[in-house]
C-alpha cells in the first residue's frame, strides 16, 4: 500500500513524522478515582467527534457506555448558530450516506429545522481549455430506494455541529467537557497498555485526569493526540491556500429553498472550474447565498485577500466566465471526431452562473495539504476523521470520509459489546483499520491524482484531460459510478 502512495506523491514533497518509541510510567487502575474512569473518551467535539458520541448514545446496544467528549472551543446552541442571517464561511458538502447517518442518530430533523439546508442536484465541472466539461444532473442519478434525488447538501459547519452537540447533551451517559483540551497523555506506553489491564489516561488543561478503555482521536488535522503519541504519517504540502467567503446571490427562494428553474436563477447547482493555479468552486447555500472556495498558489491567495470587495468580486466572476484558451482546439476536435463525442457546451462563456449581488462576509484562507496516518489504531487508541487522513477540498469528501469512519467504528463497538469483547480490544480495533484504510487511501490518492492532473498545463496532459472528461460525459454508467462514490457508496466490498 505504501508503495502505491510513493508512486502517487512526489517523494521530494513527503513529510514523515518521526516515529519514536513511546516509553512511560503508568498509573495502576487500583489508584484511580472511579468517577474518572470512562468506557470511551472522544477527543474533539467537532463534526466527526460529536457524531461519534451521538452514534454511541443513540444505539440501544451501546447507550449504557460511559462516554467523555472533550471539546476545546466554546459550544454554540442551535439558536446561536442561526442568529446571524448571513451564513458563516465554513460550509460542508454532505453526501447522502452522511445524511442517512444523521437520520439514524435522530439529528437530521434538528438540522433541517434551521432552514439553512440546501440540496444540490446538478454539478458542472470544466476548465480553461475551451473544450468540454462534465455535467452531472438529476437524470444521471439511479434511484437508491430512499427517494433520494439530491446529489448532496451544502450546510454551514456551525449549524450541523451545534445540532449534534445539542443532541449530545440529551444523553445521560455522555459527559461533555467544554473549553478544555488535552494537556498530556501521561506517558502512554504501548507495551504496558497491550500486556496489562492498566488503562490509558489523559490530563486535561484543568489538570483533571481521565481514564478509559478506548480513547478516540477526532481532533482534526492538527491532532494534539497524534502529536503527543508521536504517530507517524505521510503526506505533502500543496503550497496552496483556499480562499473562502460568502456571497449574496440575486435570486429568490421560498421557505423550502426552492428557486426558479431559469438557467441563471437557480441555486441548486454546484459550479467548479479548474484554473491553471487551482480550482474555484461556488457552493449553493440556502436562502439565496453561496460559498466560494478558491484554491490557488500562496502569492495569488494573498493578492485575493488584499483586494477591495469590488475588485475581488470581479476576479471571482472572471475566474468562472472569462473566455477560455483555444490554443489546443485542433487536438480536441480530432479526438472528438475520432470517438464521435458530442460536446455539451460547457465552455466558460456558456455557463450561466446565478447573478452575484455582493460579498457579505470577510475573506479567510487556510493552507492545503494531504496527509495519511500510518496506523489508525494503537493499544486502546483509535483515530478517525482528519486526525487520520487529510484530503484536498476540491472533491468535498473530507468530512464524509470521517463520517464513514464513525459509521464503521460505531458498528465495531456495537459488535464488541454484543460479543462480550472489551471495546478496546486490539483485534476489533484492527478490523476498523482494515476496513477504513483502503477506502480512505483510495479517495486520498484519487483526489491527489486529480489535483495533479488539473494543475498540469502541458498541451499533452491538457489534451488527455479534456478527452477524458468528454468521454466521461458521454458514458452514463461511468457517470453513475462517480455519482455513487460522491454519495458515499463504496466500490470496495468487505466480507
From Swiss-Prot:
Where is this gene product found? Answer: Mitochondrion inner membrane
Catalysis: reaction(s): a 4-hydroxy-3-(all-trans-polyprenyl)benzoate + 2 reduced [2Fe-2S]-[ferredoxin] + O2 + 2 H(+) = a 3,4-dihydroxy-5-(all-trans-polyprenyl)benzoate + 2 oxidized [2Fe-2S]-[ferredoxin] + H2O; a 2-methoxy-6-(all-trans-polyprenyl)phenol + 2 reduced [2Fe-2S]-[ferredoxin] + O2 + 2 H(+) = a 2-methoxy-6-(all-trans-polyprenyl)benzene-1,4-diol + 2 oxidized [2Fe-2S]-[ferredoxin] + H2O
**What does the entry give for GO biological process?**
ubiquinone biosynthetic process
The pathway is: Cofactor biosynthesis; ubiquinone biosynthesis
Cofactor names from the entry are:
FAD
What is the name of the protein in this document?
Answer: Ubiquinone biosynthesis monooxygenase COQ6, mitochondrial
Name of the gene this protein is made from: coq6
Cellular component GO terms held in the UniProt record? extrinsic component of mitochondrial inner membrane; mitochondrion
Write down the EC number: 1.14.15.45, 1.14.15.46
Alphabetical keyword list: FAD, Flavoprotein, Membrane, Mitochondrion, Mitochondrion inner membrane, Monooxygenase, Oxidoreductase, Ubiquinone biosynthesis
Does the keyword Flavoprotein feature in the UniProt annotation? yes
Its record classes its membrane topology as: Peripheral membrane protein
Judged by the first EC level, this protein's enzyme class is oxidoreductase
What the protein does comes down to: FAD-dependent monooxygenase required for two non-consecutive steps during ubiquinone biosynthesis. Required for the C5-ring hydroxylation during ubiquinone biosynthesis by catalyzing the hydroxylation of 4-hydroxy-3-(all-trans-polyprenyl)benzoic acid to 3,4-dihydroxy-5-(all-trans-polyprenyl)benzoic acid. Also acts downstream of coq4, for the C1-hydroxylation during ubiquinone biosynthesis by catalyzing the hydroxylation of 2-methoxy-6-(all-trans-polyprenyl)phenol to 2-methoxy-6-(all-trans-polyprenyl)benzene-1,4-diol.
Native organism is: Dictyostelium discoideum
Q: What else is known?
A: This protein may be expected to contain an N-terminal transit peptide but none has been predicted.
State where it is primarily located: mitochondrion
What family is this? Belongs to the UbiH/COQ6 family.
* InterPro entries the UniProt entry points to: FAD-bd, FAD/NAD-bd_sf, UbiH/COQ6, UbiH/COQ6_monooxygenase, UbQ_mOase_COQ6
Q: Which domain of life is it from?
A: Eukaryota
Signal peptide range in chain numbering: none
**Keyword Oxidoreductase among record annotations:** yes
Q: Which GO MF terms are attached to this record?
A: 2-methoxy-6-polyprenolphenol 4-hydroxylase activity; 4-hydroxy-3-all-trans-polyprenylbenzoate oxygenase activity; FAD binding; oxidoreductase activity; oxidoreductase activity, acting on paired donors, with incorporation or reduction of molecular oxygen, reduced flavin or flavoprotein as one donor, and incorporation of one atom of oxygen
User: What does the annotation say about its assembly with partners?
Assistant: Component of a multi-subunit COQ enzyme complex.
Amino acid at each position: 500500500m505504501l508503495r502505491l502512495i510513493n508512486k502517487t506523491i512526489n517523494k521530494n514533497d513527503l513529510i514523515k513524522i518521526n516515529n519514536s518509541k513511546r516509553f512511560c510510567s503508568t498509573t495502576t487502575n487500583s489508584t484511580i478515582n472511579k468517577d474518572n474512569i470512562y468506557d470511551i473518551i472522544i477527543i474533539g467535539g467537532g463534526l466527526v467527534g460529536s457524531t461519534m458520541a451521538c452514534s454511541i448514545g443513540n444505539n440501544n446496544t451501546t447507550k449504557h457506555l460511559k462516554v467523555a467528549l472533550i471539546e476545546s472551543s466554546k459550544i454554540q446552541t442551535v439558536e446561536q448558530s442561526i442568529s446571524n442571517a448571513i451564513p458563516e464561511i465554513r460550509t460542508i458538502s454532505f453526501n447522502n450516506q452522511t445524511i442517512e447517518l444523521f437520520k439514524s442518530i435522530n439529528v437530521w430533523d434538528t438540522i433541517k429545522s434551521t432552514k439553512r439546508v440546501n440540496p444540490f442536484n446538478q454539478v458542472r465541472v470544466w476548465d480553461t481549455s475551451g473544450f468540454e466539461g462534465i455535467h452531472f444532473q438529476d437524470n444521471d442519478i439511479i434511484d437508491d430506494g430512499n427517494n433520494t434525488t439530491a446529489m448532496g447538501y451544502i450546510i454551514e459547519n456551525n449549524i450541523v455541529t451545534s445540532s449534534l452537540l445539542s443532541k449530545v447533551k440529551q444523553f445521560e451517559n455522555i459527559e461533555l467537557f467544554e473549553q478544555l483540551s488535552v494537556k498530556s497523555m501521561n506517558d502512554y506506553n504501548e507495551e504496558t497498555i497491550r500486556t496489562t489491564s492498566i488503562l490509558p489516561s489523559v490530563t486535561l488543561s484543568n489538570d483533571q485526569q481521565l481514564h478509559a478503555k478506548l480513547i478516540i482521536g477526532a481532533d482534526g488535522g492538527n491532532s494534539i493526540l497524534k502529536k503527543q503519541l508521536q504517530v507517524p504519517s505521510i503526506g505533502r504540502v500543496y503550497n496552496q491556500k483556499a480562499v473562502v467567503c460568502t456571497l449574496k446571490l440575486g435570486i429568490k427562494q421560498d421557505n423550502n429553498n426552492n428557486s426558479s428553474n431559469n438557467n441563471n436563477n437557480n441555486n441548486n447547482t454546484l459550479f467548479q472550474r479548474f484554473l491553471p493555479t487551482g480550482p474555484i468552486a461556488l457552493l449553493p447555500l440556502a436562502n439565496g447565498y453561496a460559498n466560494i472556495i478558491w484554491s490557488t498558489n500562496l502569492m495569488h491567495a494573498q493578492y485575493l485577500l488584499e483586494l477591495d470587495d469590488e475588485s475581488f468580486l470581479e476576479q471571482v466572476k472572471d475566474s468562472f466566465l472569462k473566455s477560455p484558451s483555444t490554443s489546443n482546439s485542433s487536438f480536441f476536435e480530432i479526438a472528438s471526431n475520432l470517438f464521435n463525442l458530442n460536446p455539451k457546451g460547457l465552455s466558460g462563456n456558456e455557463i450561466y452562473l446565478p447573478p452575484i449581488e455582493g460579498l457579505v462576509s470577510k475573506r479567510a484562507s487556510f493552507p492545503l495539504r494531504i496527509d495519511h496516518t500510518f496506523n489508525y489504531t494503537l493499544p486502546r487508541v483509535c483515530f478517525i476523521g482528519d486526525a487520520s487522513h487529510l484530503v484536498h477540498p476540491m472533491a468535498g469528501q473530507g468530512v464524509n470520509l470521517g463520517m464513514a469512519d464513525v459509521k464503521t467504528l460505531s458498528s465495531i463497538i456495537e459488535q464488541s459489546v454484543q460479543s462480550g469483547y472489551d471495546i478496546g480490544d486490539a483485534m476489533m480495533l484492527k478490523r476498523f483499520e482494515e476496513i477504513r484504510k483502503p477506502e480512505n487511501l483510495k479517495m486520498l490518492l484519487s483526489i491527489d491524482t486529480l489535483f495533479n492532473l488539473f494543475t498540469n498545463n502541458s498541451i499533452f496532459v491538457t489534451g488527455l484531460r479534456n478527452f477524458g472528461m468528454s468521454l466521461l460525459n458521454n458514458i452514463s454508467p461511468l457517470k453513475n459510478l462517480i455519482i455513487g462514490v460522491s454519495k458515499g457508496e463504496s466500490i470496495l466490498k468487505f466480507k
